[in-house]
Amino acid sequence: MNIEIQYLELCREILAENEQEIAEGRWTPNRTGMGTVGVFGRMLKHDFKEGFPALTTKKLFFNSVKAELLWFLAGRTDLEFLHERGCHIWDKDAARNGGKLGPIYGKQWRAWEGADGRTYDQIAWVIQQIREIAADPERPHPNSRRLVVSPWNVADLEEMALPPCHGPFQFHVKDGRLHLAVWQRSADLFLGVPFNIASYSLLLHMVAQVTGLAVGTYTHYLNDVHIYRNLLDQVRLQLTREPYPLPRLWLNPEVREIDQFTMDDIQLVDYKHHPPIRGELST
């Protein structure tokens, strides 16, 4: 099933399961001060034969998806990289933390600091393992079930402006196809999840290209799935809209290494969407 249909059904489920709580104004409290309603433990799955999962019932700002993912892959944690590419989605989190974000995703993906004092490039390592598996798929590979990248470095959590909401994630190689599963501890269903789906789907395509594999399936595990009180009307509006066919993703076929991708090497094709629905991010 198209992942957008699954996403909209999850929105409806949360509204239905929490109908009485919403009517009585009984919100689940959290660190932001903006109450939520939600559910726990859900899964979304997508096969890219149906298109690239950029939601169509509201406009996805794909430029920010690209900028943030390239920022992570560059191992950067500063705002300058994002601002140069017109992306300001991390500004509020930085403002709460004295203008700095700390050792968040990019640091952990590309320079995880171990207890032994060494740094580990998880992205380079996992791509190398995938290439080895793809080169000799009949040979048992010791790391075939260990293709995991994690941003959740317990020793660094207190220094982060925001501990990772999404990740770890795991790749899987089967029959010449590369699959990806993502685990998300905290899922802002209206603002965050559509962005996260597109970001990790893009990462899957990029890694598949540089490892010479076809793109397989995408699985997204959502734990604490919630809708903020101030975004309920936006969700209701989105649910009145009929989805369009999903767009396609174009990657520059000349790019063969993960660090070579630029903004211009990544484009959405035939992206037909409804107008944006604005909402205030709770931080």
Swiss-Prot record:
Q: Which Pfam families match?
A: Thymidylat_synt (PF00303)
Where along this sequence does the record place binding of (6R)-5,10-methylene-5,6,7,8-tetrahydrofolate?
Answer: 188, 282
Q: Identify the enzyme class.
A: transferase
Is Methyltransferase there in the keyword field?
yes
Q: Which keywords appear in this protein's UniProt record, sorted alphabetically?
A: Cytoplasm, Methyltransferase, Nucleotide biosynthesis, Transferase
Annotated positions binding dUMP: 31, 145-146, 185-188, 196, 226-228
A GO CC term attached to the entry: cytosol
Q: Which reaction does it catalyse?
A: dUMP + (6R)-5,10-methylene-5,6,7,8-tetrahydrofolate = 7,8-dihydrofolate + dTMP
> Keyword Nucleus: yes or no?
no
Enzyme Commission code: 2.1.1.45
- Annotated active site: 165
Cellular location(s): Cytoplasm
**Pathway(s) the chain acts in:** Pyrimidine metabolism; dTTP biosynthesis
One of the record's GO molecular function terms: thymidylate synthase activity
Q: Which GO terms describe its biological process?
A: dTMP biosynthetic process; dTTP biosynthetic process; methylation
Coiled coil segments of this chain: none
Q: What does this protein do?
A: Catalyzes the reductive methylation of 2'-deoxyuridine-5'-monophosphate (dUMP) to 2'-deoxythymidine-5'-monophosphate (dTMP) while utilizing 5,10-methylenetetrahydrofolate (mTHF) as the methyl donor and reductant in the reaction, yielding dihydrofolate (DHF) as a by-product. This enzymatic reaction provides an intracellular de novo source of dTMP, an essential precursor for DNA biosynthesis.
Family named by the database record: Belongs to the thymidylate synthase family. Bacterial-type ThyA subfamily.
**What binding partners and quaternary form does the record give?**
Homodimer.
**What PANTHER family does the record point to?**
THYMIDYLATE SYNTHASE, THYMIDYLATE SYNTHASE 1
Name under which the protein is recorded: Thymidylate synthase
Source organism of the structure = Symbiobacterium thermophilum (strain DSM 24528 / JCM 14929 / IAM 14863 / T)
- Which gene holds the coding sequence for this protein? thyA
